[in-house]
Regions:
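TPR/TPR-like (Sel1-like) alpha-helical repeat modules
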Residues: 83-85, 91, 95-125
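Alpha-solenoid helical repeat scaffolds
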Residues: 25-29, 58-62, 92-96, 112, ...
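Conserved structural position within tetratricopeptide repeats
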Residues: 17-18, 48-52, 81-85, 119
């Protein structure tokens, strides 16, 4: 229910907080549901509470996305970098950093990150990696 947030789902999570509020999986899914509903502050609070119990790649990406939506770019980048350190073979954190640099108009850093993405070896081929590399190539061609 976290990935299809409705008011009922969010209300169910809220009702379960007193019982499951120390379960990191519950907290993560609750934070995702709140984020999906656009409740950035509540989502951030729950995600940070989750982080006290759990160090997780997906949680760092979620925190980065929340901070990005709050226009707190330094915090967003920090969480994307933590996700990248946790799973160095993954492309998504690098792409999120690249997209952040483009969003704030830092062409120099965006280009450096683009080169890193394009030169990064692929451990396991996927559609996501194909999309990321194709998008970065297109962006560089449009420069």
């Amino acid at each position: 229910i976290a990935y299809f947030p409705t008011n009922e789902n969010v209300r169910a999570y809220k009702d379960l907080m007193p019982i499951l509020g120390d379960d990191p999986y519950f907290l993560y899914n609750y934070a995702v549901a709140l984020y999906g509903k656009g409740c950035l502050e509540e989502s951030l609070n729950v995600a940070l509470q989750c982080r006290t119990y759990w160090a997780d790649y997906d949680l760092e990406l979620l925190l980065g996305d929340i901070y990005l939506d709050k226009n707190e770019h330094i915090e967003a980048e920090s969480h994307y970098r933590k996700a990248s350190f946790m799973c160095p073979s993954r492309f998504t954190p690098l792409y999120k950093i690249y997209s952040l640099y483009r969003r704030i108009g830092d062409g120099k850093e965006a280009t450096a990150m683009a080169q890193l993405i394009l030169e990064k070896p692929i451990k396991i081929q996927s559609n996501t990696i194909d999309f990321i590399k194709a998008q970065v190539r297109r962006d560089l061609e449009l420069k």
